[in-house]
Swiss-Prot record:
Interacts with the clathrin light and heavy chains CLC1 and CHC1, respectively. Binds to clathrin with its N-terminal domain containing 3 clathrin-binding (CB) motifs. Association with clathrin is transient. Binds to polyubiquitin and ubiquitinated proteins. It is a peripheral membrane protein. This is Auxilin-like clathrin uncoating factor SWA2. Residues 303-362 are annotated as: CB3. It comes from Saccharomyces cerevisiae (strain ATCC 204508 / S288c) (Baker's yeast).
Length: 668
């Protein structure tokens, strides 16, 4: 058996010679057909289904075991004509054909590769392009993720992109933020510790030359100003002059540069409006922190310590006068810093609302809008009160009270008007409460009572208003049958040198109820049988009237007794009507108002059903109308005694039931 690779080795050795002979010797006419068939056979023999169209180079030519290598190479076995021709071909021709096949094979391979690969490369791109584009997509995705993480920390997209380009990652930026926060916390702790050391050692104010100390000074002034504003709103009479003095001193402080202190690492500012005690340095730092606020002077009264004078231009800020070293400080948080106030140490103590030694009335400021609203509502209420519309007048007086600032003296007049209206409609308990509120607004000093109340029209002093409030207070106690408290109120008026007839009569009424006098038995008068002429009767009457003077009190007592006797005669009849009206429901104001038409026969009273009295508001309106019809001052004089007694009983019964109804329904 011959070597199957003999022809291949021979073709490789004779490659150069075959190429030369090809160039010099022309090919025969049938060589292209042979060559083409050979190429086709090789292509059919070597091509496998697994070959990919995307391969860049053709696979090497490997002989198939089915090919008969004993025959001339590259000649199809199924063609008898070509095999016979190949068998008759000389060796030189075989070599030449072999060389032509190799040349054509190489060219065909390149051509086949180019024609097959080109469409795929145009559609999919080359392998190098795929690798390059994949890397770019991966880099862009990582960049977008990192920028998104940076933006989650509050950065804008431009800042996050700039940080990413500068190699500042999310973790690194987070570390930077943590380090800055730690530095700020450490700085705040150091400032607090240094401030405590300065207060304990009694150091003076310090101002640094750097920008941080200037910022601290500005912040200090802002905080102190805020404190003064808060205290001014709480103590307006005392803060007017102090705020002006503080502004002057504030301007002076800004003109000086305070010296530095070496033992303060942060050189922070000492508060310029606080007096600090010279305390010995404490050994325990925790104790310093706990007693930090105790070293500062607050609103409470304490003894001022001795403060060392400073040689700096601002020494006057922290100087406390010698005359007040042993005196209690009042409201030291509002200390004055001007030099003029240092000589007058007690000017602030005389700025209270009612000072005994002052001749002027320190008033609470009131705006023009508040004052005009007060006068307008007061005028409406007075007009309604004169017309007998006490309910609406009470509402107008309450509006006038609500327009005034708290603790303003005009509130006394407004409350006095409200009390007068409440007496007319039977709200005695409420009138007593308002009288207590009004009495609390009076000056504590008797000397101030002679002063006129500011913005009062017409002008009235405290002495003019006080007895009116007290008399109405006593009358309210009488209507509530608290005769003991009413008597005490009348006696207090008498102690203040108020001896009005109304006061004295009220006192006697209360005394008669508390200690009723014994009833004297009248002696029976014997009738004389002797007859006298009219002339003698007239003479006797004139003589008796001239000889036996009868006092006015005795005649009034006689009339009272006659009235009491008449009432006593009608008592049973009136009691029966009132009892049938109550029907055992004295506390049920809805029942009383719904059945009131059977008693109020002398006035135009509209029937009210129980369905109309479901809402508490409707109950209140109906009650006000009923009280206005039955009030003793609203009853006409021409009314019969029986109806007067019925009206009095209705008024008192409704007043008691209304007080209980207000408590049950939480009505003011």
């Amino acid at each position: 058996m011959s070597d199957p690779f003999a022809h291949l080795l021979t073709s490789l050795k004779n490659k150069d010679s075959a190429s030369a002979s090809k160039e010099t010797t022309p090919q025969s006419s049938n060589s292209p057909s042979i060559t083409g068939s050979a190429v086709a056979d090789v292509a059919r023999t070597d091509k496998s289904p697994n070959d990919s169209l995307h391969s860049i180079s053709a696979p090497p030519l490997i002989p198939s075991p089915k090919v008969d290598f004993s025959a001339p190479p590259l000649v199809p076995t199924n063609s008898t004509t070509k095999s016979n021709t190949a068998n008759n071909t000389p060796p030189s021709a075989l070599a030449n054909t072999d060389d032509d096949f190799n040349q054509l094979f190489g060219m065909g391979t390149v051509t086949t590769t180019d024609t097959i690969q080109k469409p795929d490369e145009d559609y999919y791109g080359s392998k190098e392009d795929h690798l390059y584009n994949g890397d770019d997509a991966l880099v862009d995705e990582v960049k977008d993720m990192e920028i998104a993480r940076l933006m989650s920390l509050g950065l804008s997209i431009e800042e996050a992109t700039e940080f990413y380009e500068n190699d500042v990652t999310y973790e690194r930026y987070l570390e930077i933020l943590k380090s800055k926060q730690k530095e700020r916390n450490d700085l705040a702790i150091r400032k607090k510790e240094s401030g405590i050391k300065m207060e304990k050692s009694g150091l003076s104010n310090i101002v640094g030359t750097d920008s941080n100390n200037l910022f601290s000074m500005a912040t200090d002034f802002f905080n102190k100003g805020k404190k003064l504003v808060d205290q001014w709103t709480s103590f307006p009479p005392e803060a007017n002059d102090r705020l002006n003095n503080y502004s002057k001193t504030h301007d002076k402080v800004e003109d000086y540069d305070l010296p530095q202190v070496n033992d303060s690492p942060n050189r922070i500012l000492f508060e310029d409006n606080e007096v600090v005690e010279n305390l010995p340095p404490a050994d325990n730092p925790d104790q310093d922190l706990l007693t930090d606020f105790e070293t500062k002077i607050d609103i409470t009264k304490r003894t001022a310590p001795d403060v060392s004078h400073s040689s700096s231009p601002t020494s006057g800020i922290l100087i406390e006068e010698n005359s007040r070293r042993n005196e209690p400080l009042i409201e030291d948080s509002l200390l004055d810093f001007s030099e003029g106030n240092l000589t007058n140490s007690k000017s602030n103590e005389d700025s209270t609302l009612f000072n005994e030694n002052s001749n002027t009335d320190s008033t609470i400021p009131i705006s023009d809008i508040e004052l005009s609203g007060y006068n307008e509502f007061k005028a409406k209420g007075t007009s309604l009160f004169k017309n007998g519309d006490y309910i609406n007048s009470l509402q107008e007086y309450e509006k006038s009270l609500n327009t005034l600032p708290l603790n303003h003296p005009l509130r006394i007049i407004a409350l006095s008007n409200i009390i007068a209206s409440q007496l007319k409609i039977g709200e005695y308990s409420k009138s007593i409460e308002n009288s207590s509120m009004a009495l609390e607004l009076f000056p504590s000093s008797k000397a101030k009572w002679k002063n006129k109340i500011s913005n009062s029209d017409p002008e009235r002093s405290f002495n003019d208003i006080w007895p009116k409030i007290m008399i109405r207070r006593a009358e309210s106690f009488e209507h509530l049958e608290s005769f003991k408290k009413a008597l005490e109120t009348y006696q207090e008026l008498i102690k203040k040198n108020f001896f009005d007839d109304k006061i004295m009569q009220g006192k006697r009424r209360c005394q008669d109820f508390i200690n009723p006098p014994p009833v004297k038995k009248s002696m029976p008068v014997k009738k004389k049988t002797t007859t006298t002429s009219p002339a003698t009767k007239k003479q006797n009457l004139t003589a008796s009237s001239s000889n036996s003077p009868i006092s006015v009190d005795s005649t009034s007592e006689i009339k009272k007794r006659e009235l009491e006797n008449a009432k006593l005669a009608l008592y049973d009849k009136v009691f029966e009507k009132i009892s049938s009206w109550k029907d055992g429901k004295d506390d049920d104001i809805r029942h009383l108002l719904a059945n009131l038409s059977s008693l109020l026969t002398w006035c135009n009273w509209k029937d009210v059903s129980m369905q109309d009295l479901v809402m508490p508001k409707r109950v209140k309106i109906t009650y006000m109308k009923a009280v206005a019809k039955t009030h003793p001052d609203k009853i006409p004089e021409s009314l019969s005694l029986e109806n007067k007694m019925i009206a009095e009983n209705i008024f008192s019964t409704l007043s008691i039931a209304w007080d209980k109804f207000k408590l049950q329904n939480d009505i003011n």
